[in-house]
Amino acid sequence: MAEISPLTKKSDELTDNVIAWYRKQIRIDYAMHSLYDPLLRSATSVGANIAEAKFAQSNADYKSKMNIALKEAGESRYWIQHLTVAKCIDNDLSNCLVELLSDIINMLSSTVNK
């Protein structure tokens, strides 16, 4: 079995953490789901685009998927910052997610800027 890259590991961890947070928040206050949905979509899109890039049809397709993942990571960071200020995400989880995203953004940036 092929070794999983650090980028894939981090994007999987991001996805797992955001899904767990989302499921918990929806049980607490379903009425707020429209505020939580954008983070769920953008965070899971990071990993999905990284996974798609592994099967890219060309170098241009690969770079495009990684650029989309980079943009989605930036959007995820935006939502985390605002949901933390709104007290929808606790500081410990926020710090963990922001650290993961910083690592992911750095790795993606170095990949797309080659």
Question: Can you annotate each of these PLM segments?
Answer:
Residues 1-114:
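Amphipathic alpha-helical assembly/interaction segments
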